[in-house]
Amino acid sequence: LIVGIISPEFLSIATSLTQQFDFSELLINVMLPFLLFAGAISVNVHELLNDKWVILLLASFGVIFSTFAVGTAVFWITQQPLFGLSEMGLTYVDCLLFGALIAPTDPIAVLAMVKKMNLSSVTETRIAGESLFNDGIGVVVFLTLLSIKMEGIENITPQSVSLLFINEVVGGVILGAVMGFLGLKLVKYIENEHVELEVIITLSLVLLAPLISHQFHFSAVLAVVVMGLFLNQNIDSDKKAEGLQKAMGDYVYKFWHLLDETLNAILFILIGLEIIPILQNFALGYVFIIIMVIIIVVVSRGIGVFLPITLLSIKKQFEEKTALIITWGGLRGGLSVALALNLPDSIGEGKDLILILTYSVVLFTILVQGLTLKKIVKS
């Protein structure tokens, strides 16, 4: 990003490069399934199942609340004559789409960050699980709103929206469970020494799940996450065998860890390349609006986390500063960028504004929140 600003030649090369491929398509259909699967097989699945209702409530309420809180606030900002954005013609649904794409956190960045902090395993699992599932829920909410945008709100009924939402969520979970169960049974009959076969099987499953999901309009994100939980490194494939054996050999999990790190590095390079051309449409007048939106996003995230934790703390124990860690540790990344790029051109000039706001929030969460979280936790 900095090189692109300093060197106009690099800016030209980056612009040309990003126009040669569809970043949104590459991330959502190729990179994201691999990254989510890698995260799902490494999380502590036993503690995740014990805290499933806590994680699901945090993920679902947080995303839905943030979507409407951020979307409503941004719509109000665009309607104020003071900011001069009313001519862009952003509708309430357009602003809700921004709220939906910026609500889910980046599980890859969150998982990497959580592992570096000395948190209890329960808190670590809650944070990792919430981040994994809010991605799936966020994509479903975004696609539901996108369907309303494309078909026209007058042609949409509450029943059709509910059916679309249920089909995405339930279908994705069932598909992931079926493929995960079959995959577990398959690797169970393969000796863990045959690493190459287990790697090929897992790669095939991750490639196949999104293809089937898109065919039946299921959530590919949820399917891959659920499938990964079935092949988790903490799952015992056969408790009657000598000792407790993992579903797959250690080298398979090491392979996925390496792939996770590699794809994550590539992802952030691609995000940087995508940001550079967008900055050409940046105007100084956006600075105040960006600051306001960042504050709105962080506060909405905080409320969306604090309320469920307050309710759940009646029966569940939470480590001190859990709400603060989940709020400030809610880094945004490639998914938000990909969804923003996937917005229809019918939004008009407002799409450039949404892209700039999205990149600004992503950069703030990574550079400011990501680098200061440890200090905040220790304070």
Predicted regions, residues:
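Transmembrane helical cores of multi-pass secondary ion antiporters/exchangers
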Residues: 1-379
